[in-house]
């Protein structure tokens, strides 16, 4: 979206941080208003993450105004809130392409800009990376400042506290900014706290504090009394005792929407030594009333008209796989009071809103704590309950040791409902569910199910729920196929697939069998019709249907495996391992996700580019057969 200078006269003068820093401080509030208006207009036309960015406009302006970025290194945790940062770092004109194929990356991305220090997408990584940068900056005596911005949700993850604990121990010069937009830590925002922040971050207080420590170094009793008195006074008005105990100098809470106050506080803190912690209070969706009232709905938005003060309603078409899972939970919980549903902060995305309201005593949101979520489930399983962990494929990676150590080794009946398996689309490399079959297939005791449609998904969820060991059902983001769902549930036989189509080739030509794992079944059948190939819906990536495999390999000349998972180590690799072990030598073409991190784009665009749509599957098979 090109910039209308008449509507954004100050923003037009701040295309880069150098230009921003040349502006008079008095112009910053007006700049924030223009930046917020531009962000709203651009995202409403292109879709993307909105509410988080609206909430950090003043913080973004203040950080780039005070610090000499990119020499000073600024890291945004997760990255949903980084749209204002992209606008102010030379990418304003391209913002309308964000999350689109060949467009701006949805998150800060090192290959995209020198201002993006860390490529992000998952939460709670910023403090660890900032600490590493700060350590190296001190070793090089670079006088470089390192800043990490983390939200009140992301800071609850264990990794963030591990980094805080380490930083407090080794005492590097670094700043952690806590963007608190949920009132989860404190509500003490106002003039008193802003004044207190000025005093506590100011040079006079700092010099008195440090000087007093030196004078009293020889009198430990008085020194300890003074330290406790300081902590007691600060503890009465400041919710930062925990961070002080971790070794940080805590400042705040500060009004995160007062840009001049932020600039003053950051300038005071810029030259302080040791680990610093600035706590700011913001409102997610700030400046656009519907987003302020409903920040969850406006977190990620489709294209919409801001003047309508509402988002477009869904067409009410095909249900999503997440909906299928949510309905399954509710149906099962009616008759199973030992069903326990666990999610690491993905209630809405995993389709669990209805369940959380109808069965609150059986619903557990662990916040951003995937490791804890998995081991929590193991404890419930040991107690004789039936836990189900609803988790995105990309986030299950974060609980891998717990999956092995706390579930699989004990062969506990924990089911993993793995959403966003395969290509997720606009969120790009960090969110593609490309590896779960590969990293689960090597774990003993695991059962891995790959439904081809929503009805099969429902039956597999039931199968996993009734299974006496660990199991996983993986399904993609987005709409299902639209077939009628059988409300009656019946457990499938573990490790058994089914034939969908049989070739009619008898004498001429090579007989091809397509072994489908997952929701590419319709694409496989369409390609098979053109090739007159056999199609098997394998259903289970582990254990494989060895009987069906033996039948197919003896009656066909070529096998083709297809899955929406990395080819390396995936279901196709399992097929080859079985054939080699049993000396069944036949050529096997493996189709799936290549050995690369796959960028953003729609699911349809990426399937076509990777030749995993029906046309691409047919072409890859023809090329392999040299037809």
Curated annotation (Swiss-Prot):
Record-level Gene Ontology MF annotations: 1-deoxy-D-xylulose-5-phosphate synthase activity; magnesium ion binding; thiamine pyrophosphate binding
Reactions performed catalytically: D-glyceraldehyde 3-phosphate + pyruvate + H(+) = 1-deoxy-D-xylulose 5-phosphate + CO2
Classification via SMART domains: Transket_pyr
The organism's place on the tree of life at top rank: Bacteria
Keyword annotations from UniProtKB, A to Z: Isoprene biosynthesis, Magnesium, Metal-binding, Thiamine biosynthesis, Thiamine pyrophosphate, Transferase
CDD domains with a match to the protein in the record: TPP_DXS, TPP_PYR_DXS_TK_like
Membrane-spanning parts: none
One example of a Gene Ontology biological process annotation: thiamine biosynthetic process
Pathways per UniProt: Metabolic intermediate biosynthesis; 1-deoxy-D-xylulose 5-phosphate biosynthesis; 1-deoxy-D-xylulose 5-phosphate from D-glyceraldehyde 3-phosphate and pyruvate: step 1/1
Top-tier EC class: transferase
HAMAP family for the chain: DXP_synth
Protein name as annotated: 1-deoxy-D-xylulose-5-phosphate synthase
Organism listed in the record: Aliivibrio salmonicida (strain LFI1238) (Vibrio salmonicida (strain LFI1238))
């Amino acid at each position: 979206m090109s910039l209308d200078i008449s509507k954004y006269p100050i923003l037009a003068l701040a295309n880069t941080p150098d230009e921003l820093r040349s502006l008079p401080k008095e112009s910053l509030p007006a700049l924030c208003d223009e930046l917020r208006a531009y962000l709203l207009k651009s995202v409403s036309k292109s879709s993307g993450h909105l509410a988080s960015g609206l909430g950090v406009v003043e913080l973004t302006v203040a950080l780039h105004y005070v610090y000499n970025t990119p020499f000073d290194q600024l890291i945004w945790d997760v990255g949903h809130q980084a749209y204002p940062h992209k606008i102010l770092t030379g990418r304003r004109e391209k913002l309308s392409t964000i999350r689109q194929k060949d467009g701006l990356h949805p998150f800060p991305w090192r290959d995209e800009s020198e201002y993006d220090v860390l490529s992000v997408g998952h939460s709670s990584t910023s403090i660890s990376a900032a600490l590493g940068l700060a350590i190296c900056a001190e070793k090089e005596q670079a006088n470089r400042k390192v800043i990490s911005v983390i939200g009140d949700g992301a800071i609850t993850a264990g990794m963030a506290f591990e980094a805080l604990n380490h930083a407090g121990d080794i005492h590097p010069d670094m700043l952690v900014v806590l963007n608190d937009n949920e009132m989860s830590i404190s509500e003490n925002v106002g003039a008193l706290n802003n004044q207190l922040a000025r005093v506590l971050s100011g040079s006079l207080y700092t010099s008195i504090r440090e000087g007093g420590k030196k004078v009293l170094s020889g009198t430990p009793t008085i020194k300890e009394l003074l330290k406790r008195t300081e902590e007691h006074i600060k503890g009465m008005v400041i919710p930062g005792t925990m961070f002080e105990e971790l070794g940080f100098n805590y400042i705040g809470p500060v009004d995160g929407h007062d840009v001049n106050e932020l600039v003053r506080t950051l300038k005071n803190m810029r030259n302080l030594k040791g680990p610093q912690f600035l706590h700011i209070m913001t409102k997610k969706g700030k400046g656009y009333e519907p987003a302020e009232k409903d920040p969850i709905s406006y977190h990620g938005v489709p294209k919409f008209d801001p003047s309508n003060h509402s988002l477009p309603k869904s067409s009410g078409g095909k249900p999503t796989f997440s909906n299928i899972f949510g309905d399954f939970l509710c149906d099962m919980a009616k008759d199973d009071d030992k069903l326990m549903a666990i999610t690491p902060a993905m209630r809405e995305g995993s389709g669990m809103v209805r369940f959380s309201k109808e069965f609150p005593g059986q619903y557990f949101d662990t916040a951003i704590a995937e490791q804890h979520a998995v081991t929590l489930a193991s404890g419930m399983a040991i107690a004789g309950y039936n836990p189900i962990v609803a988790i995105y494929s990309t986030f299950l990676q974060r609980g891998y040791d717990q999956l092995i150590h706390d579930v699989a080794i004990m062969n506990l009946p924990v089911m993993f409902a793995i959403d966003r398996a395969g290509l997720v689309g606009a969120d790009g490399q960090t969110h593609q569910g490309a590896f779960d079959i590969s990293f689960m297939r090597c774990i003993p005791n695991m059962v891995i199910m790959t439904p081809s449609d929503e009805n099969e998904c429902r039956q597999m969820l039931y199968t996993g729920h009734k299974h006496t060991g660990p199991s996983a059902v993986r399904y993609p983001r987005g709409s299902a196929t639209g077939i009628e769902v059988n409300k009656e549930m019946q457990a499938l036989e573990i490790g058994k697939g089914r034939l969908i189509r049989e070739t009619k080739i008898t004498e001429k030509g090579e007989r091809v069998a397509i072994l489908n794992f997952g929701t590419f079944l319709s694409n496989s059948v369409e390609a098979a019709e053109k090739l007159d190939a056999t199609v098997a819906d394998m259903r289970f990536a582990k254990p494989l249907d060895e009987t069906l495999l033996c039948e197919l390999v003896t009656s066909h000349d070529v096998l083709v495996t297809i899955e929406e998972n990395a080819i390396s180590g995936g279901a196709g690799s399992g097929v080859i391992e079985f054939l080699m072990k049993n000396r069944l030598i036949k050529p096997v073409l493996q189709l799936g996700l290549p050995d690369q991190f796959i960028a953003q784009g729609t699911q349809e665009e990426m399937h076509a580019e990777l030749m995993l749509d029906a046309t691409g599957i047919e072409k890859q098979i023809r090329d392999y057969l040299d037809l």
